[in-house]
């Protein structure tokens, strides 16, 4: 069974975990509808790249 030979300090542990974190989604203002949406996704109204791609029922 592997056991640690030396104690890792708090700074060493935090340096190792520095890449772990939350990613902020890239939210943009849609030019055609004026709604906020995540980039490279269809807007809630069904518009993508200035074209209606999904018909709302």
UniProtKB/Swiss-Prot annotation:
SUPFAM superfamilies: Zn-binding ribosomal proteins. Residues 9-19 have a biased composition (Basic residues). The lineage of its organism: Bacteria, Bacillati, Bacillota, Bacilli, Lactobacillales. Keywords: Ribonucleoprotein, Ribosomal protein. This is Large ribosomal subunit protein bL32. It holds the Pfam family Ribosomal_L32p. GO terms for molecular function: structural constituent of ribosome. One of its GO terms (biological process) is translation. InterPro entries: Ribosomal_bL32, Ribosomal_bL32_bact, Ribosomal_zn-bd. Disulfide bonds: none annotated. Belongs to the bacterial ribosomal protein bL32 family. Residues 1-25 are annotated as: Disordered. GO terms for cellular component: large ribosomal subunit.
